[in-house]
């Protein structure tokens, strides 16, 4: 059996502004249009499909596995845009990154309060005795 993640919806007050904001920070191409969606496509074929929501938006968490060079580029854009970032999801370590499982990671607040994260190694992927998330 083969099961792959394909897409998820991201609720936004302004569909295109939110999709462009995320694309800009991540260094992705301009979103494409598919019906009511502004779509960001990733290298593995999965998509984030941004859709307008006029009601109260419940913030969600979206994490992206990135290479070391991409991490550096994204982190630079976050700093250039004067965005706050944290090493942890509880906002205890502002302006720092984590080194979970021997990689690097950080969190920032994206459009409509969604919590975005980049990591260079999946959590839980370190060898026994490896570094833990800080």
Label each PLM-derived region with a short phrase:
Residues 22, 75, 120:
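Short, flexible helix/strand-to-coil boundary loops that buttress conserved ligand/catalytic motifs
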